[in-house]
């Protein structure tokens, strides 16, 4: 059986693809780096859309905030361009947010790698599963 997607999910997926191209092509502000749209959440009434982004190469919170500010100020222009590309009765208002999950995931991966490295250094003691054999 095919997986069911709601209308808002389909709109969000299409918006994600279209916005990625529009930002790359149309937004010429140097304060906006290499933006990746990680997710788009569209409200049930299709009136608002939260666009979650990451910015490659910008780890500084001020730079990220500046990129978000620029994208939010360009939201009207991007919305107008989306209206030309998408066949919708009304295009949602765009709200850009920084996606912290990618940075959090990288931090957790680093913690896990460090813990594994420490365990391998102290590897003299057998693991509890190995002791039973």
Curated annotation (Swiss-Prot):
Q: Which PROSITE patterns match?
A: RBFA
| One Pfam assignment | RBFA
Write out the entry's keywords from A to Z.
Cytoplasm, Ribosome biogenesis
Question: Sorted alphabetically, which SUPFAM superfamilies does this protein's record hold?
Answer: Ribosome-binding factor A, RbfA
What would be an example GO MF term here? ribosomal small subunit binding
> What's in the GO CC field?
cytosol
Give the source's domain of life in one word: Bacteria
In terms of InterPro entries, this protein maps to: KH_dom-like_a/b, RbfA, RbfA_dom_sf, Ribosome-bd_factorA_CS
Q: Which GO terms describe its biological process?
A: maturation of SSU-rRNA
Q: Where is this chain's protein located in or outside the cell?
A: Cytoplasm
Provide the family line. Answer: Belongs to the RbfA family.
Its quaternary organisation is: Monomer. Binds 30S ribosomal subunits, but not 50S ribosomal subunits or 70S ribosomes.
Cite the HAMAP family for this sequence. RbfA
Biological function: One of several proteins that assist in the late maturation steps of the functional core of the 30S ribosomal subunit. Associates with free 30S ribosomal subunits (but not with 30S subunits that are part of 70S ribosomes or polysomes). Required for efficient processing of 16S rRNA. May interact with the 5'-terminal helix region of 16S rRNA.
Report the protein name in the record: Ribosome-binding factor A
Report the source organism: Pseudomonas fluorescens (strain ATCC BAA-477 / NRRL B-23932 / Pf-5)
Q: Which gene encodes it?
A: rbfA
């Amino acid at each position: 059986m095919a997986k069911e997607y709601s209308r808002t999910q389909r709109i969000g997926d299409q918006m994600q693809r279209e916005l990625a191209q529009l930002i790359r092509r149309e937004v010429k502000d140097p304060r906006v780096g290499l933006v990746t749209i990680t997710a788009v959440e569209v409200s049930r009434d299709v009136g608002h859309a939260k666009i979650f982004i990451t910015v490659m190469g910008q780890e500084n919170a001020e730079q990220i905030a500046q990129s978000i500010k620029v994208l939010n100020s360009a939201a009207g222009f991007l919305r107008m361009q989306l209206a030309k590309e998408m066949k919708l009765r009304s295009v949602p208002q765009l709200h850009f947010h920084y996606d912290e999950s990618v940075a959090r995931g990288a931090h957790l991966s680093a913690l896990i790698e460090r813990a594994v490295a420490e365990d391998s250094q102290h590897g003299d003691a057998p693991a509890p599963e190995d002791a039973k054999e």
